[in-house]
Amino acid sequence: MAEVAASPAIARDLSNIRMQAWNLFVVGFLVLFLELACIRWFAAYVVFLQFFTNVALLASFLGMSCGCMAARQERDWLSYFPFIALGAVLIALAMFLAFHSWSGLVVDVGGQRSPQEVFFGTEYKDPDIARFVIPIEVIAALFFVLIALMFVGPGQVLGRAFDTYPNRVLGYTLNIGGSLAGIVAFSALAFLQAPAGLWFLIVCAAVGYLQYQAGSLDRVKVLALIMLVVGLSIPTVWLRGEHARHWSPYYLIDHDIGAGYIGVNGVAHQWILSFAAAGSPYSLIHLLNQHSGGAPFQDVLVIGAGSGNDVTHALKFGATRVDAVEIDPAIQQIGRQYHPDHPYQDPRVVPHLDDGRHFLRSTDQKFDLVAYALVDSLILHSGYANIRLESYLFTRQAFDDVRRVLKPDGIFVMYNFFRQDWIVQRIAAMAEAAFGCRPTVLSLPYEERVKDLPLNSFTMIIAGCNVRIADAFAKHKDFWLDSVPPRNLAIDGFTLRPETLAPDQTRNLQRIAPSAVDYGADTMFATDDWPFLYLRGRLIPDFTLRSMALLGVLGVGMVYLFLPKGRFALNSRMFFLGAAFMLLETKAVVQMAVLFGSTWLVNSAVFFTILILILLANLYVLKVQKVNLTWHYIGLVLILAAGALVPVEVFLTGGTLWRYGAPCLLALGPMLFAGVIFARSFRDAPQPDLAFGSNIAGSVVGGLAEQLSMLLGFQHLLLVALLFYLLSIWSPRARIAAT
C-alpha cells in the first residue's frame, strides 16, 4: 500500500523536475536573447549609450545576480517584468524625443571640446548655450538600474530552478543549451534585419510561458506584455515624409530617402551625394594624383565604402577595378538602391561585405590606391570590450597590412573629420613608421598647422613613398578645389590662379596646401594590443572613472537589497571565478576581432564557441566524478601566463596554423579549464542560487575591470584575470558570511 500511495507523489516530483529542466532551458534562452535585445535597442534610443554598451551588459548581469539571490523570496519578480520594461522603454523614448526636438538639452560626454577620449557625433550641441546639460554618467546610471531590474525576474526563475533541480551540473548544462539557442535565434534575426518589435515579441512569449508555468499569468500581465510589444514596435514604424528605418546587425538606421541622409542610432552618419552636385573632397586624391603627373589609379580599394560616394569618384577618374569593402549590409544595400550615380551597379565594382582589417589580412591583391573613407562606426564592437568597429584599422600593425597590399608606387589615403590634433599626429606618426616616408597632411579649410581643429575641419592624410604629390606641392605651393565636382575635371588645381578669374568663377574655390603636423619619436602609437586611437594616452578618462564609481555603488546597493535578509553571503570563490571569466571573454572577443574581423557574425561565433566550451566542461564534470581542481588550476595559470607574456607580434607571420591557430588556442583555451573549475565548484556549493548569483555579481566586477585595458592593453589584462583566479584559489570553499 505504501508503494502504491507513494506513486502519485513520485510522479509529481518527476513532473516538477521535468518542468524545472525545461525552465532552465527557457530562462537560459530568455536571458541571453533579452541581453542582446537590450544592448541593441537601448543603444539605439538612449542618447549616446551606443558608446557605452557595456552598461546594458553589466546591468543584465547585475539583475540576474540579484534575481538568483532573491530565489527564496515570496515576491514574484517576473510579474513586474512587463511594467519595468515598459517604463524603461517610455523613459528612453521620451529622452530621445526631448534631445532631438529641444536644442536647449545637451548630453555631455566627457567634455568633447578638450576631451581625453573622442566620441564622434557627440559634440554638435554647444553646452555653453544650453539650458539643461546632462552628464552621460547620469543617463548611464539611470538605465543601468532600469535594465538591471528587468533581469531580476528571469534571474529569480533561474535561481529557483537551480534550487529545485537535483543535478546542478546537468541543470547548468540545460541552461547553457538555452543560451546557445538564444544566440542562434538572435543572430538569425540580425541576419534577417528583423525589427525590434519581433525581438521583444519573442521575449514576451518566453516571459509569458514562465509565468504560466508558475501559475501567475493573468489578464493584467498579458495586457502589459502586449503593451510592451506595441510600445517597442511604434518607434520602428514612425515614418516622417520619406524616412525609412532599418535594423541592421549593427545599428538602427534612419534613412531620409529624399535628402540622402543616413543616421545611425540617432547620430548623423553620412550623406548620399551625387557627383554632379557635391562631394569634391572625395575627388581630391584623384585630382592630386592626376595633376602631379600620375596615371589614373587602376586598382582601388575603398574601406568604408558605405553608400558609395568614394566609389563613385574613383570610377569617374578612370579606375578599372574598385574593391568596395563595407561592414554593414543595410548601408551597402541603401547605396545599391538609392545612390543617384549607381556605383554598385558598375561592373568595375567588386563589393565585399567584410571587416576592413580582415580584408587587408586575407587578400592577395595589390592596389594603386587604398582609401580609408570616413571610417567612423559610431558604435562599440561589443559590450565586452571598449573598442569600436574601426579600432583595428588604425593600429601600427594595420598600416603594415596596408603597405603589404599596395603596389610599389601605391598611395594610402585616410580622410575624416578627426576633431583633435593629437589624433592626426598619432595617425601621421604611425604612417611614417610603417612606410618610412613622412605623410602629407591636408586640412579643409586650410590650416597652416594642425592644431585646435574646428569640428568642420576635413583632414586628409596621404601616406606611402610616392613623392609626386609632395613634390607638386613643393613646386606650386597651392592646389585649388572647386566645391562642385564636375568643374574640377576642366581645371588643373596646381596651376590655376584665382586672381586671374572673374569673381563668380572663384566663389566655390577652396585653397588646399599641406599643413604642418607636430609629432616626434615619443608619439604614442595605437597597436593591436592597445587599439585606442581616440584615447589621448594610456589612461582611464575621468568621466569613465566617475561612471565606474557610480555604477559600482549602485551595483553594491542592489546586491545588498536583494541578498537574503539578516546575512551577507557571497560565495567568494564563485565571485572571483565570475570576475576572471568576464576578462577571458573580453580577451577572446578582441583577439578574434583582430584575426577574423569586427563583424557581428564573428562576434556571434565567438560567444557561440565560448558556450560550447562551457558545455564541454560541464559534460566532463558530469562524466568524471573526482575532478582534481589543482591540475586544472595549473593548466589555467600556465596558459594565461603564456597569453599575457608572449608578444602578439609573434603571430603576425608564419603559416596559417601559427597565425590563426595559436592565438585562438591562447584566447579560447583557458575557458575550458575555467569551465571545469566552475562546474566542479558549482556542483559542490552548498546553496546553488547564492553560488550562481555570486558568480554573476563577479562578472559585473570583471566588466568594470575591463576598463583597465585602456591602461594596460588587452594582453596584460590577462594578468588581472590571473589575479582573480588566484584569489579564487585562496578562498576554496568560500563564503563570506556574517549573521
How would you describe each model-predicted region?
Residues 2-739:
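Alpha-helical transmembrane segments of multi-pass membrane proteins
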